[in-house]
């Protein structure tokens, strides 16, 4: 799904904003200064999400399984008061032990989709520099952009 600030909402967004308390959400959105919740530098916000996600990964010692459901994909997140209707057909469910790899795989599947609605979601992702969260997480060293897709629909 898309996200109004992060560009997309996947494992990294859920590890950071999704798990955070109200104060934690403000802290992340404000890049360490909750008083700047809506005025902080946008790329710094994406980096703060990657950093917050790392704290959860570190806390659990990597003992997390990530499940991204690519269904009812809209340019908006369910955190929006009124989200746009889905713009893409369902793609599937991805599972990984690497939050960076699963988010990269999801973005790749959106870009590769044979779906005219993808242009709306891609526009949201790119206009918010959404891939920067993946880049920042990779720089922090808690995952990889490399993955192997295994299709189990015919097994």
Report each predicted region and the residues it spans:
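Extended, low-polarity segments enriched in aliphatic/aromatic residues
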Residues: 1-155
